[in-house]
């Protein structure tokens, strides 16, 4: 299966903390991206891994770097030209446990669309039907540009798919809550809290 790790965000809240981009945080001797790529190959021998980034210095064994053609809005992390059938979007600023990656790989193809995460954060989107996901993505993007909604993220795509209010954090059909540990790093506080919990 094709896995696209989204690592082309602005990182404004992270603000180059410790002189690093979020994706270059090292935990247990490897960066977040190195860990995710390694685990994907461990649990899916046929994994094709793509990392979306304009950083020409980014080279991770086992992954190909791709420069998105359009990265204006936050929703554009879902690189439109890479959306297709039988694929998965993952987040480059997330620490994935082995169990989380195993859950993602094992649920490939289970539903037309399957969002995976906690009650607070989406950590993966499994796509069996690329045309459906692209339609939802384009609808949310258009609604945001027209001023009909105030946020334009993965949550809005999920809520449109599930028939839930677009401004909520409700969870319904097509969402798998994983108890497996994942942690996203949006700010220095996120990182420091995680490290303090490891000691």
Please annotate each region the language model reported.
Residues 1-18:
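N-terminal nucleotide-binding beta1-loop-alpha1 segment
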Residues 2-5, 33, 48-49:
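Hydrophobic targeting segments
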Residues 18-24:
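Short alpha-helical oligomerization interface
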Residues 30-46:
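A short, N-terminal amphipathic alpha-helix
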Residues 56-90, 95-99, 103:
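Short phosphate-binding loop-to-helix
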Residues 96-180:
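Conserved core of the sugar-phosphate nucleotidyltransferase
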Residues 174-199:
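C-terminal catalytic/acceptor-binding lobe
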């Amino acid at each position: 299966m094709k896995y696209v790790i989204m690592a082309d965000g602005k990182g404004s809240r992270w603000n180059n903390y410790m002189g690093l981009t979020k994706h270059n945080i090292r935990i247990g001797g490897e960066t977040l991206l190195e860990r995710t790529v390694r685990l994907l190959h461990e649990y899916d021998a046929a994994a094709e891994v793509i990392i979306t980034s304009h950083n020409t210095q980014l080279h991770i064994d086992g992954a190909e770097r791709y420069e998105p053609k359009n990265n204006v809005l936050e929703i554009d992390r879902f690189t439109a030209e890479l959306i297709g059938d039988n694929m998965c979007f993952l987040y480059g600023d997330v620490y994935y446990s082995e169990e989380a990656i195993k859950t993602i790989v094992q649920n490939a193809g289970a539903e037309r669309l399957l969002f995976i995460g906690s009650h607070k954060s989406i950590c993966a989107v499994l796509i069996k039907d690329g045309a459906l996901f692209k339609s939802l993505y384009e609808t949310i993007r258009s609604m945001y540009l027209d001023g009909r909604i105030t946020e334009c993220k993965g949550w809005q795509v999920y809520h449109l798919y599930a028939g839930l209010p677009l401004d909520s954090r409700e969870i319904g059909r097509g969402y798998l809550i994983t108890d497996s540990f994942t942690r996203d790093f949006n700010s220095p506080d996120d990182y420091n809290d995680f490290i303090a919990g490891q000691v």
